[in-house]
C-alpha cells in the first residue's frame, strides 16, 4: 500500500513539474536554485558519517537537476580506495533501520525536488532488501559540465574494513544540459520514427557490431511503469552515471515494430480512409505513376521516286509517299477531285499527277499484272506475229442477225437441212447457237443470234466473234428496230455485211422498198451502184440459197482468214449453262490454235480441265481446230457468255492465276450495295425478284429487259440470279426477302415443290421472254395503290328532323336529283362546305325499308354517326370506284 501511494504521489509530482515548466515557472525556480547554492557554499562542512558494517552495497545518491527536475544528475559513487569490507544484509528490518538512522547531507533544492528525491531513495532501499550482492562506497567525483559517454568498469575487489569515513565536500552547482525527457523517461529522439535509407542492391549493408555494454537502470526511476519490465532481481551493482542524451548507448531502441518487407496491399478501404491510420503496419502503397514517353520527332525523309501497282487506294498511296491520307485528300479536293481514304485509284494519270503535286515521281509497277495477264495481245495480233508458213486457212464464222420473226433460224435450217425452228418456244430463238455446216463451197461456222430486243448483248458478242454478218431482212416488213441495232454492232466490229432479203415468195414482197431503206442507213446496194451485197432468198422454197453460199465463200477469200493450229488454243465462250449430271458446261468457239482433251483452261474468274468435248450433234471430239465450236465439261464454275479463254500449262497454274484475280477483285470490290436514296425519298415501291434460267445468256437478257422497265412509282430489284433449276435455297431466300421467283426455260426441283406451298412463295415459269417481261410489269402495277374516284348518284334536301331515343336523329328528305341508294357514301353539304362524310345506314319510305329512292319522292334517312345535320342541308349520295394505276 505504501508503495502504491508513493507511486501515485510520484506521478502527480512529475505532472506538476511538467505543468510548471509549461507555465514558465522554471526561470523562477532557477533563480531560487542559484540563491540556495550560494548559501550552501557559505555553510561549514558536516562531519563524515560512518557506514554500517552490515551494508555491503555501494551507496548511490542521486541529485535532482535544478534546471530540469525530470532529468537525473550524474551519480556520485564512493571511491574504491575507501571501500569497506563486504558484509551481508541479515534481514529486512535491520537493513532499513540502519539506513534510516544514518545521517544524510542536506540537498539545496526546492520542495518539489526534495520530495521527489526522498521518495526515490525510499523506493531504492526497498528494492535492495532481498538482494545479496556486494556493494562499495566511494567518494563522489567532482561534477562535470559536459556529458560524456561512460562505460561501466568492473569494480575492484573490496577490502574488508569495519568502518569507512566519507568526507563530503560542499556540492557545487552542476550545469546540466536540458534534455527533452518525457514522462516515460525516454528521450524525444528515441520516440520519433527513424528513417533508414534502403541500401543499394549491389552494396550489402555491413553487419552491426554488438557492443557488450552493461545497460543499467537508475535506482530512482522516474516512472513506476518501468518496474514492470525491470524486476529488482535483474538490477546490477555497477555504478550508474547520468544518461548521455546526445548519444545512443547499446542497441538501437525503436518505439515501434520493424516494418514488414512485404506490406499489405493497397485496398479500396485505404482509398476512402476507412482503415486505421494510426496502425503503423498499415501504410499506403504509393502508386507507380506511368510516365509519358516522349518520342523525339525525327525529320521524315519523303521519297522522290516510288513505284506502285494499280489499282491502289488513297491510304496505300499515302503510306508509300510517307504522307498522311488527309494531305492527299486535301490536295485532290483543291483540284476538284473528291475522294475518301478507301477510294481506289486506277487511273495512271491521276496517280502521277498526285505525285507531282508533292514532288514525287511515281512509276506504275505492272509486274503483278504481267503474271496474271497470260494473253498480252489479241488473237488477231497473235496471228499476225506468227510465221506465215505455220498458218492455214480456216472456215469463216458467219453470224445471222436481224429482227425477230424475220426468218433467220428457218434460213439456217435450210442451209443445214435441219428443222431447228420447229422446236423453238414461241417460234423465236432465245439462245445463241453455233453450228458447223458443210456446203458445196466449203465448211461454214454459223452463229444463230436472237432477234428479240432483250438479246442485245448476245448480238453484240456474235458480231465481235464472227467474220461475216448476214443481215436478214423480211421483204414484206422492211427494216425494223433490231435490224438497225445489228447494223450498229457490225459496224462497231468492222465486219463485212451481206444483206439477205428473205421471204421473197410472199406476194407483198417489195425489194425496192428494202433498197431505199438500206440506202438511208448508208448501206447502198450493188443494184443501185453501191458495195453492199444483197440477195433475195426464201427459206421455204430454197430460192437464193446457193447464191448466198457463193457470196459467203467469195467474201471469205477476200478476207484471207488464217490461223495457227499448232499454237495454244484461244477463243470465246458462246454460251454456258448448268447441266444436271455434267455440272457447268460451256459452248466455246476456238479462234486460234487447237484445243485437246485434258488441257487446262483459264477464263476470267474460273478455270477448268477439259474432260469431255462434243459437237452440235452430241458426238465426242478429241480436238477442236480453229473456227470449230465445241461443248466442253470439267469447269470449276460457269463462265460468263463472252469471256475469253486460253490454255495454260497445267491445272495448278490455272488455279493460281484465277485465285490471284479473285483476290484482287475482292480487295477493291464494294462490300455493301449503296441504298437507293432516290427511291427512299420518293417513297417508291420495290418489286424484289429472283431469276433462274437455263443458260447465262438468258439471265442476262431477261435481267436487262426487266431493268429497262422505268416508272416513277415502282421499280424492280433483282436480288439474285443463277443458272439451273429452282432449288430449296432459292425458295428460302424468296420467303425471307418477300421476293418473287421468275423461272425462264427451267423447272423446279422435285423436293422443293412442297416447300413452295409451305412458305407461300410466288413462283412463275416462262418459256418466252416477252411473256416474262409482261408478267413483271403486271406485278409492278399491282404494287401500286389504286386511284379512288367518287361518282355522284343523287342528292336530297333535308326538310325535317326527328329525334329517336333508340336510333338517334332521323332526317326527312326530298330527293332533288338522281337516286338515293342505301349502304352508299353520303356527304352533308352546308352552303359550299362539306361538314360530314359517312355511310347511309337506313333508307325508308312510308315506314318501309327500301334500297333506293328516286327523284321527286320523300324518304327518311338515317346517317351512321351523324347528329349535327340541319334543316336545309344537302345530302349527296356517291359511290367510290377504284382504278388501277399505270406505270
Swiss-Prot record:
Top-level lineage group: Bacteria
CDD domains, per the entry: IF2_eIF5B (cd01887), IF2_mtIF2_II (cd03702), mtIF2_IVc (cd03692)
Protein name: Translation initiation factor IF-2
SUPFAM superfamilies per the UniProt record, alphabetical: Initiation factor IF2/eIF5b, domain 3, P-loop containing nucleoside triphosphate hydrolases, Translation proteins
Protein source organism: Chlamydia caviae (strain ATCC VR-813 / DSM 19441 / 03DC25 / GPIC) (Chlamydophila caviae)
Gene behind the chain: infB
Gene Ontology terms, MF aspect: GTP binding; GTPase activity; translation initiation factor activity
tr-type G domain span: 393-562
Keywords: Cytoplasm, GTP-binding, Initiation factor, Nucleotide-binding, Protein biosynthesis
Amino acid at each position: 500500500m505504501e508503495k502504491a501511494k508513493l507511486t501515485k504521489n510520484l506521478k502527480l509530482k512529475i505532472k506538476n513539474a511538467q505543468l510548471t515548466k509549461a507555465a514558465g515557472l522554471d526561470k523562477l525556480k532557477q533563480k531560487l536554485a542559484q540563491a540556495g547554492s550560494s548559501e550552501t557554499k557559505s555553510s561549514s562542512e558536516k562531519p563524515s558519517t560512518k557506514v554500517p558494517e552490515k551494508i555491503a552495497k555501494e551507496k548511490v545518491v542521486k541529485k535532482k537537476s535544478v534546471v530540469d527536475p525530470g532529468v537525473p544528475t550524474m551519480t556520485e559513487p564512493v571511491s574504491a580506495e575507501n571501500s569497506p569490507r563486504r558484509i551481508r544484509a541479515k534481514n529486512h528490518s535491520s537493513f532499513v533501520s540502519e539506513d534510516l538512522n544514518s545521517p544524510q547531507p542536506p540537498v539545496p533544492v526546492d520542495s518539489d525536488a526534495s520530495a521527489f528525491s526522498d521518495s526515490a531513495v525510499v523506493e531504492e532501499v526497498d528494492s535492495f532488501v532481498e538482494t545479496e550482492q556486494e556493494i562499495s562506497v566511494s567518494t563522489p567525483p567532482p561534477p562535470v559540465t559536459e556529458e560524456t559517454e561512460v562505460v561501466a568498469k568492473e569494480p575492484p575487489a573490496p577490502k574488508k574494513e569495519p568502518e569507512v569515513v566519507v568526507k563530503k565536500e560542499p556540492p557545487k552547482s552542476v550545469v546540466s544540459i536540458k534534455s527533452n525527457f518525457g514522462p516515460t523517461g525516454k528521450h524525444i529522439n528515441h520516440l520519433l520514427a527513424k528513417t533508414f535509407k534502403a541500401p543499394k542492391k549491389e552494396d550489402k549493408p555491413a553487419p552491426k557490431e554488438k557492443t557488450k555494454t552493461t545497460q543499467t537502470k537508475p535506482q530512482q526511476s522516474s516512472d513506476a511503469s518501468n518496474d514492470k519490465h525491470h524486476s529488482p532481481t535483474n538490477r546490477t551493482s555497477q555504478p550508474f552515471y547520468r544518461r548521455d542524451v546526445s548519444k545512443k548507448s547499446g542497441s538501437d531502441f525503436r518505439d515501434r515494430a520493424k516494418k514488414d518487407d512485404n506490406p499489405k496491399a493497397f485496398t479500396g478501404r485505404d482509398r476512402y480512409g476507412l482503415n486505421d491510420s494510426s496502425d503503423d503496419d498499415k501504410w499506403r502503397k504509393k502508386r507507380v505513376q506511368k510516365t509519358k514517353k516522349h518520342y523525339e520527332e525525327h525529320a521524315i525523309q519523303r521519297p522522290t521516286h516510288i513505284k506502285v501497282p494499280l489499282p491502289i487506294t488513297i491510304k496505300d498511296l499515302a503510306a508509300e509517299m510517307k504522307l498522311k491520307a488527309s494531305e492527299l485528300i486535301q490536295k485532290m479536293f483543291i483540284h476538284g477531285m473528291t475522294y475518301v481514304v478507301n477510294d481506289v485509284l486506277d487511273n495512271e494519270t491521276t496517280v502521277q499527277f498526285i505525285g507531282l503535286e508533292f514532288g514525287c515521281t511515281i512509276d506504275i509497277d505492272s509486274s503483278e499484272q504481267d503474271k496474271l495477264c497470260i494473253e498480252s495481245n489479241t488473237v488477231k495480233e497473235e496471228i499476225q506475229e506468227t510465221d506465215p508458213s505455220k498458218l492455214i486457212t480456216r472456215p469463216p464464222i458467219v453470224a445471222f442477225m436481224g429482227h425477230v420473226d424475220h426468218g433467220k433460224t428457218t434460213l439456217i435450217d435450210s442451209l443445214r437441212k435441219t428443222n431447228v425452228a420447229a422446236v423453238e418456244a414461241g417460234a423465236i430463238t432465245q439462245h445463241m447457237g453455233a453450228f458447223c455446216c458443210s456446203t458445196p463451197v466449203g465448211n461454214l461456222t454459223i452463229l444463230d443470234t436472237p432477234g428479240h430486243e432483250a438479246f442485245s448483248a448476245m448480238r453484240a458478242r456474235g458480231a465481235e466473234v464472227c467474220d461475216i454478218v448476214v443481215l436478214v431482212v423480211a421483204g414484206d416488213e422492211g427494216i425494223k428496230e433490231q435490224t438497225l441495232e445489228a447494223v450498229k454492232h457490225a459496224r462497231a466490229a468492222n465486219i463485212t455485211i451481206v444483206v439477205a432479203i428473205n421471204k421473197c415468195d410472199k406476194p407483198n414482197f417489195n425489194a425496192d422498198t428494202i433498197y431505199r431503206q438500206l440506202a438511208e442507213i448508208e448501206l447502198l446496194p450493188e443494184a443501185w451502184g453501191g458495195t453492199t451485197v444483197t440477195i433475195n432468198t426464201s427459206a421455204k422454197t430454197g430460192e437464193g440459197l446457193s447464191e448466198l453460199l457463193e457470196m459467203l465463200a467469195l467474201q471469205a477469200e477476200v478476207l484471207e482468214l488464217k490461223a495457227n493450229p499448232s499454237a495454244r488454243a484461244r477463243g470465246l465462250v458462246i454460251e454456258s449453262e448448268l447441266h444436271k449430271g455434267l455440272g457447268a458446261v460451256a459452248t466455246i468457239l476456238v479462234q486460234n490454235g487447237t484445243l485437246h482433251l485434258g488441257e487446262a483452261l483459264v477464263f476470267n474468274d474460273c478455270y477448268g480441265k477439259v474432260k469431255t468435248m462434243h459437237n452440235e450433234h452430241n458426238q465426242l471430239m478429241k480436238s477442236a481446230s480453229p473456227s470449230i465450236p465445241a461443248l466442253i465439261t470439267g469447269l470449276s464454275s460457269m463462265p460468263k457468255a463472252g469471256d475469253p479463254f486460253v490454255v495454260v500449262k497445267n491445272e495448278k497454274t490455272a488455279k493460281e492465276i484465277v485465285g490471284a484475280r479473285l483476290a484482287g477483285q475482292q480487295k477493291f470490290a464494294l462490300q455493301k450495295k449503296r441504298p437507293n436514296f432516290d427511291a427512299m425519298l420518293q417513297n417508291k415501291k420495290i418489286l424484289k425478284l429472283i431469276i433462274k434460267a437455263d443458260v447465262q445468256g438468258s439471265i442476262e437478257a431477261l435481267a436487262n429487259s426487266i431493268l429497262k422497265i422505268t416508272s416513277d412509282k415502282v421499280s424492280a430489284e433483282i436480288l439474285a440470279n443463277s443458272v439451273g433449276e429452282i432449288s430449296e435455297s432459292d425458295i428460302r431466300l424468296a420467303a425471307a426477302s418477300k421476293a418473287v421467283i421468275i423461272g425462264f426455260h427451267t423447272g423446279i426441283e422435285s423436293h422443293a415443290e412442297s416447300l413452295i406451298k409451305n412458305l407461300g412463295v410466288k413462283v412463275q415459269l416462262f418459256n418466252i421472254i416477252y411473256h416474262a417481261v409482261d408478267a413483271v410489269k403486271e406485278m409492278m402495277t399491282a404494287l401500286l395503290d389504286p386511284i379512288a374516284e367518287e361518282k355522284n348518284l343523287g342528292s336530297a334536301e333535308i326538310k325535317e328532323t326527328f329525334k329517336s331515343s333508340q336510333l338517334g336523329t332521323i332526317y326527312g328528305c326530298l330527293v332533288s336529283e338522281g337516286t338515293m341508294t342505301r349502304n352508299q357514301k353520303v356527304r352533308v353539304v352546308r352552303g359550299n362546305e362539306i361538314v360530314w362524310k359517312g355511310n347511309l345506314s337506313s333508307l325508308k319510305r312510308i315506314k318501309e325499308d327500301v334500297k333506293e329512292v328516286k327523284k321527286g319522292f320523300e324518304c327518311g334517312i338515317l346517317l351512321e354517326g351523324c347528329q349535327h345535320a340541319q334543316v336545309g342541308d344537302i345530302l349527296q349520295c356517291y359511290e367510290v370506284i377504284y382504278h388501277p394505276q399505270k406505270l
